[in-house]
């Protein structure tokens, strides 16, 4: 059996993963279960068959291309949308070529709203070259509890990561998704070594904003 893209569901969480067969999918889901302590009871809400491993990886790359500009600190993307709209986006990505990527991205951009909650907040996390797409109602609760000026800070942070080429390579992706304790110094050191002073300044500002945000939410 060729690789498949699985869309998995557990409570309010959604993930995608590429698996060689159902047995691989079970193993991957087990690792997710262990990590997030969600217990058993996974439900596959969709399985997208592909004709080859290369095609599966290409589809995963397309998904990443569309959603990557929204990745921010702690793996949270502020896209509010309905589950139906989210799955429709995946379907569009499957049938798209590179020329239509920007159109899909533009559609998503118009769909999400920071102040009027009418869908879910989705996130993507990169781990060992596998990307999980998901949503969490806990972040919605936190977001809605923020004051307007605090939301504006977070919006400003999103604008940083949507600007120009800031999310084009893995180091910058890590900068957006890093764990403060484990990776921040390593990422900052890398950015300094490659001489990207503007990116370094932006990352410092993002770190300041989100450390403050985390304190307010705890």
Cite the ranges covered by each PLM segment:
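Non-catalytic accessory segments flanking enzymatic or RNA/DNA-binding domains
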Residues: 1-218
């Amino acid at each position: 059996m060729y690789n498949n893209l699985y869309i998995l569901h557990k409570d309010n969480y959604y993930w995608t993963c590429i698996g060689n067969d159902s047995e691989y999918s079970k193993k991957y889901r087990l690792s997710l279960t262990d990590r997030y302590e969600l217990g058993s009871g996974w439900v596959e809400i969709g399985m997208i068959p592909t004709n080859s491993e290369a095609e599966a990886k290409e589809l995963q790359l397309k998904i990443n291309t569309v959603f990557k500009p929204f990745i921010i600190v702690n793996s949270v993307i502020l896209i509010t949308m309905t589950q139906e709209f989210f799955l429709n986006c995946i379907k569009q990505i499957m049938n798209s070529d590179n020329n239509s990527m920007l159109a899909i991205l533009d559609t998503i951009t118009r769909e999400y709203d920071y102040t009027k909650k009418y869908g879910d907040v989705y996130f993507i996390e990169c781990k060992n070259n596998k990307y999980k797409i998901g949503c969490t109602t806990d972040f919605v609760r936190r977001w809605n509890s923020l004051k307007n000026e605090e939301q504006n800070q977070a919006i400003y942070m999103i604008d940083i990561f949507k600007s120009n080429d800031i999310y084009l390579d893995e180091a910058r992706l890590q900068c957006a998704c890093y764990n403060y304790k484990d990776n921040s110094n390593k990422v900052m050191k890398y950015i300094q070594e490659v001489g990207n002073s503007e990116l370094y300044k932006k990352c410092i500002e993002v770190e300041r904003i989100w450390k403050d945000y985390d304190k307010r939410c705890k």
